[in-house]
Amino acid sequence: MAKKKKQIHLNIIDFQKYYQTDDLLLDTSISTEKKTVDNQKFIRKNRTLEKDEVVQNIDWRTFDNEKEKETNNENTSNVNKIKSPGLEKKNFKKSNDVITLGARNKNKSTNLNADDIDFTNLRNKKKEDDIDFTNLRNKKKEDDLDFSNLRNKKKEEEDVDFSNLRNKKKEDDVDFSNVRNKKKEDDLDFSNVRNKKKEDDVNFSDVRNKKKEDDLDFSNVRNKKKEDDVNFSDVRNKKKEDDLDFSNVRNKKKEDDVNFSDVRNKKKEDALDFSNVRNKKKEDDLDFSNVRNKNKEDDMDFSNVRNKKKEDDLDFSNVRNKKKEDDLDFSNVRNKKKEDDLNFSNVRNKKKEDDLDFSNVRNKNKEDDMDFSNVRNKKKEDDMDFSNVRNKKKEDDLDFSNVRNKKKEDDLDFSNVRNKKKEDDLDFSNLRNKKKEESKENDTNKSEKPLYLRRLEEYRKKKKLESQANDTAMKMHEKEQIDDIQERKEEIKEEFKEEVKEEIKEIKEEIKEVKEEIKEEIKEEIKEVKEEIKEEIKEEIKEVKEEIKEVKEEIKEVKEEIKEVKEEIKEEIKEVKEEIKEEIKEEIKEVKEEIKEEVKEEIKEVKEEIKEVKEEIKEEVKEEIKEVKEEIKEVKEEIKEEIKEVKEEIKEEVKEEIKEEIKEIKEELKNDISSETTKEEKNTEHKKEETEKKKFIPKRVIMYQQELKEKEERNLKLLEQQRKEREMRLQLIRSKTQGTSSTFIPSAKLKHLESLKEEKKKEVKTNIQPKDNNNNNNNNNNNNNNIAVLKNNKNEEQNVIKKKSIFLEIAEKTENAKIVEKTDIEEIAKKKREELYKKQLEKITKKNEEHLKYNNIYKHDVNIIKNFYNEIKDKIIQNYYFNQDDCISLCSILKTDDCNYMESHVPFYVVISIFMLSLPQKLQNDDYFKRASNIKNLLIYLKENSKIENHEDYILNDTLKFCDQLKYPHLSEETSLIETIFDTLLYSGVISKNSFIQWFQDDDSNAELKSKAMLQLIYWHKWLTEEEKDQEEEIDELDDTEEKNISDVSDIEKNVPKNFIFKKIKKKLF
């Protein structure tokens, strides 16, 4: 039994070694027992437990004596209760709540529940399902284990035979009896691990011997085994032509070899001069005389390699300092420089979410982590609740509070666990043996390991270190060999390059010689070929001439045939022409009839158009005539009022002047008229007497009557003259009022007036008739009377001349005034005519300009617009998105050599009309705005390229007219067609908000249509105007608050977005 006890003790210690952590591994440098023990003590003393830390399996880590354990404080003893099961037996006091299996204190009474087990008589079986502990060794069920003979294998296949565990029972089992022996082909044979078992394994028994062709023979690595291997046995001796002869490497064996006997001497131009290798011979060579100095930009400056010369170089002067962002700062590697770096200064602290917090690794940091601080408490649903692991939490869990009672069919019945219920169950009836013996041995050797185990561990570690050192030495040796081989290869390459260069030179010279020879041969061959070609050409020429003759004869025959064919063709052509003529005549008749019908239709259409045009022209002419008449009436009324005012002024002035002149003339004429009247009265009395005497009417009466008539005519003439004089005076007064006091009289008129004066003087002389005296007897009296009469006549003549001179002056004045008045009236009339003509011209030019504007705005070609319409229509209906490139390609049709129709309003009108007709009913606002955003680029492109002033007004007026023609339809119960189109025009940025407001305010010819549309646009118009008011109110509020809190306003202005107004519109739109 003693031997068995020792073996068990050894196995337990080995298991403790495997459970050891990496922190308490033994150092390889310390070999003695004292050093290991002291170090372990020092580690344990200095190690401080952190908060909520529980140390497990501590009794095999410590090497203290039992005396030292007893001297510790109460706190440490309480901690050790949890740590070691040995101390638990001594110091732990059982409480009433704790159930201990196998307890024999029957005197202590416990409060039993219904489900609790009565441990007073635990051995007796109470239920059928309970285990009968009285005889636990006996197997009760087929599935129970038979503990009476646990060592014996009960099942052939599944059970392990513990009676002889070391022996292998199955093919797959490990044979622990002699684990060193190899049982399978794939297993290693530990009995003699050096022996090779497989082809691929290394034979460690004699690793020096070569087993495969590819293996190195380490037994005599110097001997060459393959053709390609180096023979290290006598590496100095040259075996192949290509090998170096190391026996006397200094002696030159080949021409190409380096002569190492005097390697310092330079033999070739290209060779290095080793006599003074430090001196630089070529530009490309390194100058070894001062290799530390930097000679090129790309070279390293070895004089001070620590200093950084380039941006990319490492600064060796202080390699610890960080030079780049990506470099580690070795000066203080513990400090974290980047976000992604670990902070080594305090690696225990958690820096990222994904990192472990080593400061308190027991605490749970993530949802998926276990909370080691209180591992007993349940953190997740799936975790076990260790705080009260005895209580059953789920249906599938074991109820440890009453673990003895079997709850399910598949559960073990611990109430009588000693009894074997099934064949597969263990028999615990004799399970208590071999427990005390092990515990005693463990108590004696708890604190310390045996010496041979420690030495074994040290020996193993030394072995490992030696093997590692050997491996490193081998690797270093191999590296040196590889470096030598690479150096040699480089030298061979350089030599090979030099040989190749020399060979190339020789080949070039040979090629030159060969070229010269080839040239001479080619020249001779060319001469021979030329002669041969000449002879062949002559023969071919002869043959060609003969062929030409034959061809000429054939051509003649062909010409004759062609003539015949031509005659036949002419006849056929005549027949065809006649047929064609008849067909053409019939077609012409049909075409004429069709043309006549078309012409009639066109004429009808033209007549209708002409009628419409005539009606339009008549209306325009009537309107113009009305306007002209109204203007003429206004002008006439103005002239009449002016004339009245002037007449009244002139009448007053003329009356006063005439009165004064008449007074003067009357006073002068009184004397003359009195003398004449006396003579006439005498004559009349005399005549009356004669008439009374004679009853018949004599010739004198007739003459008198004639004279009276003449007088009446003269009086009428005088009256006319007076009237004319008055008119002349009026004209003079008008001229004075107009500022024309000086009148211009032509010279011809003056001469004419002088001649008239002379004629009047002559007439006066002839008119003086001599009066005959009836009484011939009284001649003397008559002579005296004649003398008196002559004197009187002279005086009369003088008076008459004076009168006539006055009248002439008045006449001249009146004639001149008439001429001036006529010129003034003509000038006034001309001015008025010119003014009227100018006004008419202005109206006509205005109308022409309006017509030109209208034509420019609506200029179009029908075919081009049709093509444009056909291309756009399907895309707009399919809700196609127009890019900038699509707009350019589609609108390229509108540009022609004659005219650019993009400048007009027609293409825009076509697009918007198609869009209006393509809008479906009963859609949401978002869908309409998506459609508008698809067509937005095309509308903006057409508007930008148009050259129309106030284009926005034309767009709105035309959309309004189009909606009026459609009779203002509704797309849904809430929205109408006009509202959606106005929204699209505003949302797409084609028409600005201010232009909408101005359009509503303007009074145009479309005022009636606007008033109709306002029935549907009332709320839309309110929305526009209210926004402006809101903005103005906001601005006023800001102005008021600026005076109070300037800082608050500045913060608000920063936070307000640039497109604040547009965002507000957007919210109301959507």
From Swiss-Prot:
- Per the database entry, which stretches of residues form a coiled coil? 475-736
What's the practical application here?
Answer: Possible candidate for an effective malaria vaccine as determined by epitope response in sera.
Q: Which UniProt keywords apply?
A: Coiled coil, Merozoite
Biased amino acid composition, Low complexity: 73-83, 773-786
Q: Where is this region: Disordered?
A: 66-88, 355-388, 423-483, 667-692, 735-786
Q: Does the keyword Coiled coil apply?
A: yes
Which cellular component, as a GO term, is one annotated location?
cytoplasm
Which residues fall in a compositionally biased region of kind Basic and acidic residues?
435-460, 474-483, 751-765
Q: What is this protein called?
A: Uncharacterized protein PF3D7_1120000
Spell out the Polar residues composition-biased ranges.
Answer: 735-745
